[in-house]
Design a protein with these regions (language model features):
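Extended catalytic-interface subdomain
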Residues: 197-226, 232
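An aromatic/glycine/proline-enriched structural segment found at the starts
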Residues: 106, 114, 143-199, 295, ...
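Short helix/loop capping segments that flank catalytic or ligand/cofactor-binding pockets
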Residues: 132, 154-156, 167, 211-215, ...
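M16 family metallopeptidases and their MPP-like homologs
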Residues: 1-4, 19-63, 94-119, 141-147, ...
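Short, structured secondary-structure elements
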Residues: 39-43, 76-83
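Sec-exported extracytoplasmic/periplasmic mature domains
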Residues: 9-14, 27, 31, 61-69, ...
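C-terminal regions of mature proteins
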Residues: 145, 297-450, 459
Length: 522
């Protein structure tokens, strides 16, 4: 219903009743607009030429002051929602989430079908829309981000002028149960037949809300440790045992009250057959983390890189930036919405250990996705085939896992810059490279950054082969060679990537191209 309401707000207001008037104003002034509905908020955003910005604010604010909810266009917007739903029918991520939500806590909002369709919205009345609008759309539950070349004082005047009329209904923020996975002393397994030919294993754990711990970043700490790819990492051992080709750990804050952490493993064919061994290794790594002290050096490394990235990274602009900041307003104060990823305080291991303590066998839901897995049921909305089982005996086995000495915390990262400062030199438009070496078989150019003055370096190497050797067989062998080199370097290169360094080693038209980019300095 929230998603459908998002669509209906674009259908005219009392001040601008034309159903396409808002969109036409955007198009006429080089702009575009969009919106999305998440689990706990709806986010409206747009960008437009600067000279039309105040006019757009006047029109946009009316969405939240006097929308028409034009009944004659209800069917059109239902079909638009249906179209969004249909385009994702073969999206494996959507299909997987729809199935996983079937096994969440009954009645929890995380169980709800989020997109909507003609079937689920067909009986929605205009009164229901208005009731929902009045129950949730209130000035005290809204946030506004403006970005323009106008002075901040002018933007403040415009904000008051156009948005002050939004009614404040004094509606409290909605609260949600923090545990959407019911604790069960059993191994819960979902098996899904995918559309694409993929093999993945996902371990999901629900977490309590942790927005107030943004200075200690416990979610980011867990992600970076579990998802590490260096020596002693979970992925390193999975690769050595030929069980996986990749691994991603992610934590997210769905609402102020709850979040989740998931470990997604890309399986080899052997890993698919031995998926239970993969589960054991994942839990063994978590056991190792729970038995270890919080790695203070790792926190300091993340804090250092966050400080560097705040200064030197591209922050984005336009609709993407304001949408991101407005989304942060749901969980963070206005003063920090643009700095949340970069803000670190002193190390506080308590929030880290609290989240880590929630990675338990009892609140774990495992999803195995691959062609040919046994299925018994069909999900209603996406038609995906799946099966669900519980195994108390395997759960007991998982509670008594032996430690694996191969699994350990990552070493201190030697690539983290100890100190980086802005280069002290004058800006100049003279950016032509200088040829410093010109010998048979070797040409070297150097170009000094005199424009952006960032403490970054870029090294580019090209190893050229005689064109007569670059036949199809040679290119295939070269591709295999570069793939093997990249794989063999991954454990070394991963800490470098964490330190803002990246490299590329790939075959090209003339031979092998090798590049290194990132922070320069000590």
């Amino acid at each position: 219903l929230a998603h459908f309401l998002e669509h209906m707000l674009f259908l005219g207001t009392q001040k601008s009743p034309g159903v396409d008037e808002y969109g036409a104003y955007m198009n006429d002034n080089g702009g575009y607009n969009n919106a999305y509905t998440a689990g706990d908020h709806t986010n409206y955003f747009y960008e437009i030429n600067h000279n039309a910005f105040e006019g757009s604010l006047d029109r946009f604010a009316q969405f939240f002051i006097a929308p028409l909810f034009t009944e004659e266009f209800t069917e059109r917007e239902m079909n638009a929602v249906q179209s969004e739903y249909q385009k994702n029918l073969e999206n494996d991520s959507r299909r997987t989430y729809a199935i996983q939500s079937l096994f969440y806590r009954p009645g929890h909002p995380e169980q709800m079908f989020g997109t909507g369709s003609l079937e689920t919205l067909g009986n929605v009345t205009r009164k229901e829309l208005l009731d929902f609008y009045e129950a949730h759309y209130s000035a005290d539950r809204m946030g506004l981000i403006l970005m323009s070349n106008e002075p901040v004082d002018s933007l403040a005047v415009w904000a008051r002028r156009h948005f002050a009329q939004i009614e404040n209904r004094d509606i409290p923020q909605p609260r949600y149960p923090s545990d959407y996975l019911v604790d069960k002393p059993t191994f819960r397994l979902i098996q899904i037949e995918p559309v694409k030919d993929i093999r993945t294993l996902e371990l999901e754990f629900d977490l309590p809300g942790f927005a107030d711990t943004y200075l200690s970043k416990p979610g980011e700490m867990l992600m970076s440790l579990i998802g590490h790819e260096g020596a002693g990492s979970l992925l390193s051992l999975l690769k050595k045992e030929n069980l996986a080709t990749g691994l991603t750990a992610s934590s997210y804050l769905a609402t102020l009250d709850y979040g989740a952490l998931s470990i997604r493993v890309e399986l080899t064919p052997e890993g698919l057959e031995s998926y239970r061994d993969v589960v054991k290794l994942c839990l063994s790594y978590i056991d190792m983390l729970q038995a270890s002290a919080s790695p203070a050096y790792h926190f300091q490394e993340q804090r250092t890189m966050a400080a560097l990235n705040e200064i030197y990274s591209d922050k984005g602009e336009g609709a993407g930036a304001v949408s991101r900041h407005a989304g942060n307003l749901v969980k963070y104060s206005l003063e920090i919405v643009d700095r949340v990823p970069y803000l670190y305080g002193d190390e506080d291991p308590a929030p880290y250990h609290l989240l880590l303590s929630h990675l338990r066998r009892e609140n774990m839901l495992v999803t195995l996705t691959a062609k040919g897995v046994p299925t018994t049921d069909t999900e209603t909305h996406y038609g995906a085939q799946y099966s669900y089982s519980e195994d108390a005996a395997f759960y007991q086995e998982l509670t008594h896992l032996p430690s694996r000495p191969e699994l350990r915390l990552p070493e201190a990262n030697p690539f983290i810059p100890a100190a980086v400062s802005i280069p002290v030199r004058a800006q100049s438009d003279d950016v032509l490279p200088l040829r410093v070496i010109d010998e048979p078989g070797l040409t070297l150019y150097h170009s000094l950054d005199t424009q952006f003055l960032r403490p970054k370096a870029s090294l580019q190497y090209k190893f050229r082969f005689p064109l007569e050797r670059m036949d199809l067989r040679f290119k295939v062998l070269l591709d295999m060679y570069t793939t093997c080199v990249n794989e063999s370097l991954n454990e070394l290169a991963y800490p470098a990537r964490l330190a803002g360094l990246s490299y590329s080693f790939a075959n090209g038209y003339e031979g092998v191209y090798f590049s290194i980019n990132g922070y320069g300095g000590s």
